[in-house]
């Protein structure tokens, strides 16, 4: 029975937030750029720069707020926008001509919110002319100061562009990880960028230098290759282009080394480009559709019954199930990809139609499983599915049905009874549990494509490691190779459960290449200094949980194997000792219950001190900083005691004054410790103003005098008006007056008289009454 093409209505757009605005933009602006998210739940509409507001609309199906942005006149709007293929949550990236890139995410809070902002062209003077998103990478073509190299229209100005790439991956629940910028091509013409699921196509534009406007490039990041093709010449060449190995090409040098590519040839006359999983579709002005494949070869697909109406006529191309779909104005044509035969032609009710790629495999909703692999068509009337209608009467059994049918035959062969078993009996009988268990597993199973999407990061890392190992075996740039290998291995290990062999491997990497290992940890924890010189981290809690985890009872590692936190402290002691106290302080802020901070077991500062060695052999400066920054009362008192022994009065007083109002008892203990020194000798007299500031506000003058009496040294003889030569001067009332005034002032301000010394301190103008004289 002959199949027929169908347009099945998936949604009338009422299920999308902001449906009225969505219909208005689709129906009113033919130049609007439309993209669908990988999960099929979001639609992105972007008007070209200079269009009326709003320029950006992201409509979401079901729960979830839409995103609508407008930029006022004089302020540039985004050059392009893309959804990112992140399985955990929807995300999109906006790129401006100036090089500004913003990453927005949903699902981590109410509505859409910005996750990160970065500059793609930090040096200034550059202009982004094209951008594309390719499987966790952001690729852009930028123009670099063409006017400085030559006048407009000159070869120097025409080859003043470069193509750059930067990795863009999710990191934790609400952050992103941006890699370093790599230059793929420099001194190249202006290229348009089109991305499919595996390749990036660099195509000529209207401003490309005519002498090279017949050349296209196909970059395959997974293979680390770039294909240079000239379809009209029938030539294609393959070259290595792997940013991970530092590969880069000068475009002019690249073409000079490929015979025949610079032969005089007219530029490609292409009306519409369309990337597909099979390659790049080219529609010329005569209505002929060709396919440029990943190996550089070109083949004709077929000729449409209608040709594009001029260069500005709308056209959209796509493929599904071996079929080419082309929308020209209000006409939809379906051609067989193999033979080029016209299969069906439909006249649509509107010419404002946009073709959308199907959702990524494994990310579809349950309602869309029936339309898997089919194209989607968006108009103001709704969202439609373009596909083939299967012949009536043909219904494929589900995986659950196949399980029970296969089990039925298996049990029937082993059964001794003559009655015939049926699949329905196996479904409801409690005797046959194996097929029921298998059917329940299959009901919630993930397809291989979804599993591959989830494991893509790990697979990419493993592949990169294997390539790097091969490079090291070959002896190419060993120092940089070992550094990159260590960084990748540490990043991989931090994503695993750090026990057993993984923990031993992490220790080995830190011992062999500590600098590279610490650099990888620095990026994993996203450590950076703020304006006050304090360490800050944007890493998600699960990363810190692995780093701060201690030793579980019964799972002690072998001798010489350190837990991750101790390993990082040891590495910092070797590389940057001054970073150790701020790192431990930050770790204590990040730790949760049972992580090694704030839970049972040794506190983090004591674990860090254990790395420094036994007591008495540790570096004194580091030990003091760790104790002071720990925030633990015993540790701070121990540090202040050591400072007092060394007579470092300023640091001891600063340690007490640095404590906030939330630590009154600790401040009081430090004050008493220093007050005892003040009572016994005069080496603290120069710091009396700071000691007065440290005085507890609730301390009354009488209590102060009682404390001083406790700390005063015992008198060994009768009192004398003057100290012996060479002896320590005693405490005088003049020195004590400042402290008494401090406590008296606080007591006066707090309310009633707190001691019998208040009248002396606060009313010196009124002398006491004269005692009567004995006559």
Curated annotation (Swiss-Prot):
Q: What does this protein do?
A: May regulate the synthesis and function of lysosomes and of highly specialized organelles, such as melanosomes and platelet dense granules. Acts as a cargo adapter for the dynein-dynactin motor complex to mediate the transport of lysosomes from the cell periphery to the perinuclear region. Facilitates retrograde lysosomal trafficking by linking the motor complex to lysosomes, and perinuclear positioning of lysosomes is crucial for the delivery of endocytic cargos to lysosomes, for lysosome maturation and functioning.
Q: What is its main location?
A: membrane
One GO molecular function term of this record is: small GTPase binding
Q: Which disease is it linked to?
A: Hermansky-Pudlak syndrome 6: A form of Hermansky-Pudlak syndrome, a genetically heterogeneous autosomal recessive disorder characterized by oculocutaneous albinism, bleeding due to platelet storage pool deficiency, and lysosomal storage defects. This syndrome results from defects of diverse cytoplasmic organelles including melanosomes, platelet dense granules and lysosomes. Ceroid storage in the lungs is associated with pulmonary fibrosis, a common cause of premature death in individuals with HPS.
Cellular component aspect of the GO annotation: BLOC-2 complex; cytosol; early endosome; early endosome membrane; endoplasmic reticulum; intracellular membrane-bounded organelle; lysosomal membrane; membrane
- According to the record, the segments passing through the membrane are none
UniProt entry keywords in alphabetical sequence: Albinism, Cytoplasm, Endoplasmic reticulum, Endosome, Hermansky-Pudlak syndrome, Lysosome, Membrane, Microsome
The opening ranks of the lineage are:
Eukaryota, Metazoa, Chordata, Craniata, Vertebrata
Q: How does it assemble?
A: Component of the biogenesis of lysosome-related organelles complex-2 (or BLOC2) composed of HPS3, HPS5 and HPS6. Interacts with HPS5 and HPS3. Interacts with biogenesis of lysosome-related organelles complex-1 (BLOC1). Interacts with AP-3 complex. Interacts with MNAT1. Interacts with DCTN1 and dynein intermediate chain.
Q: Which InterPro entries does the record associate with it?
A: BLOC-2_complex_Hps6_subunit, HPS6_C, HPS6_N
Protein name per Swiss-Prot or TrEMBL: BLOC-2 complex member HPS6
Q: Which tissues is this chain's protein expressed in?
A: Ubiquitous.
Determine the domain of life of the protein's source.
Answer: Eukaryota
Q: Write out the GO biological process terms.
A: blood coagulation; intracellular transport; lipid homeostasis; lipid metabolic process; lysosome localization; melanosome assembly; platelet dense granule organization; protein localization to membrane
Tell me if Ribosomal protein is a UniProt keyword of this record: no
Pfam families for this protein: HPS6, HPS6_C
Location(s) in or outside the cell = Microsome membrane; Cytoplasm, Cytosol; Early endosome membrane; Lysosome membrane
């Amino acid at each position: 029975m002959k199949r027929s093409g169908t347009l099945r209505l998936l949604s009338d757009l009422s299920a999308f937030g902001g449906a009225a605005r969505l219909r208005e933009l689709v129906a009113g602006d033919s130049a609007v750029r439309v993209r669908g998210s990988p999960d099929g739940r979001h639609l992105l509409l972007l008007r070209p720069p200079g269009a009326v507001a709003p320029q950006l609309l992201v409509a979401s199906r079901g729960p979830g707020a839409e995103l609508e942005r407008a930029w006022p006149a004089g302020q540039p709007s985004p050059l392009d926008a893309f959804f990112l293929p992140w399985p955990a949550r929807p995300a999109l990236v906006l790129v401006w001509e100036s090089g500004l890139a913003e990453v927005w995410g949903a699902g981590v809070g109410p509505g859409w919110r910005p996750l990160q902002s970065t500059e793609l062209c930090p040096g200034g003077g550059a202009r982004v002319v094209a951008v594309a998103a390719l499987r966790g990478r952001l690729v852009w073509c930028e123009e670099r100061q063409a006017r400085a190299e030559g006048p407009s229209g000159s070869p120097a100005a025409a080859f003043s562009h470069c193509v750059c790439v930067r990795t863009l991956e999710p990191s934790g629940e609400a952050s992103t990880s941006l890699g370093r910028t790599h230059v793929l091509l420099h001194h190249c013409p202006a290229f348009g960028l089109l991305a499919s699921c595996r390749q990036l196509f660099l195509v000529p534009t209207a401003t490309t230098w005519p002498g090279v406007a017949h050349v296209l490039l196909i970059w395959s990041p997974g293979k680390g290759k770039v294909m240079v093709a000239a379809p009209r010449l029938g030539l294609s060449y393959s070259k290595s282009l792997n940013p991970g190995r530092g590969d880069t090409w000068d475009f002019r040098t690249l073409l000079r080394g490929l015979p025949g590519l610079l032969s005089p040839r007219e530029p490609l006359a292409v009306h519409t480009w369309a990337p597909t999983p099979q390659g790049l579709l080219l529609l010329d002005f005569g209505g002929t559709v060709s396919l440029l494949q990943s190996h550089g070869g070109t083949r004709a697909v077929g000729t449409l019954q209608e040709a594009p109406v001029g260069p500005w006529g709308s056209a959209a191309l796509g493929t599904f199930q071996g079929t080419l779909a082309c929308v020209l104005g209000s006409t939809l044509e379906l051609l067989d990809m193999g033979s080029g035969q016209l299969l069906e032609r439909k006249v649509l009710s509107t010419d404002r139609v946009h073709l959308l790629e199907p959702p990524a495999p494994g990310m579809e909703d349950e309602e869309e499983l029936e339309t898997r692999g089919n194209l989607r068509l968006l108009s103001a009337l709704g969202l439609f599915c373009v596909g083939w209608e299967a012949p009536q009467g043909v219904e494929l059994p589900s995986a659950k049905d196949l399980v029970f049918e296969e089990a039925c035959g298996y049990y029937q062969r082993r059964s001794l009874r003559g009655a015939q078993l049926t699949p329905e009996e196996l479904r409801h009988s409690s005797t046959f549990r194996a097929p029921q268990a298998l059917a329940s597993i299959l009901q919630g199973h993930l397809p291989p494509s979804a599993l591959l999407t989830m494991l893509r990061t790990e697979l990419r890392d493993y592949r990169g490691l294997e390539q790097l190992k091969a490079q090291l075996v070959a002896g190419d740039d060993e120092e940089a190779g070992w550094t990159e290998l260590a960084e990748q291995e540490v990043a991989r290990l931090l994503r695993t459960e750090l026990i057993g062999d993984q923990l031993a491997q992490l220790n080995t990497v830190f011992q062999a290449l500590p600098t590279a290992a610490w650099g990888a940890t620095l990026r994993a924890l996203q450590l950076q200094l703020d304006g006050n010189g304090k360490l800050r981290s944007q890493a998600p809690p699960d990363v810190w949980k692995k780093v701060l985890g201690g030793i579980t009872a019964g799972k002690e590692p072998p001798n010489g194997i350190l837990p991750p936190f101790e390993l990082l402290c040891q590495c910092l002691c070797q590389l940057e000792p001054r970073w150790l106290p701020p790192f431990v302080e930050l770790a204590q802020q990040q730790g949760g219950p049972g992580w090694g901070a704030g839970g049972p077991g040794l506190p983090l500062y004591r674990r860090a001190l254990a790395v420094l060695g036994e007591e008495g052999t540790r570096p004194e400066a580091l030990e003091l900083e760790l104790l002071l920054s720990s925030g633990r009362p015993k540790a701070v008192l121990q540090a202040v005691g050591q400072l007092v022994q060394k007579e470092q009065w300023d640091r001891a007083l600063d340690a007490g004054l640095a404590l906030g109002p939330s630590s009154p008892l600790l401040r009081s203990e430090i004050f008493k410790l220093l007050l005892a020194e003040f009572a016994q000798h005069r080496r603290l007299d120069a710091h009396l103003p700071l000691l007065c500031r440290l005085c507890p506000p609730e301390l009354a003058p009488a209590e102060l005098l009682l404390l001083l009496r406790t700390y005063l040294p015992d008198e060994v003889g009768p009192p004398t008006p003057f100290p012996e030569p060479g002896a320590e001067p005693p405490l005088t009332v003049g020195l004590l007056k400042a402290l008494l005034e401090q406590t008296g002032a606080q007591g006066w301000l707090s309310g009633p008289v707190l001691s019998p010394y208040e009248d002396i301190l606060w009313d010196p103008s009124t002398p006491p009454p004269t005692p009567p004289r004995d006559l």
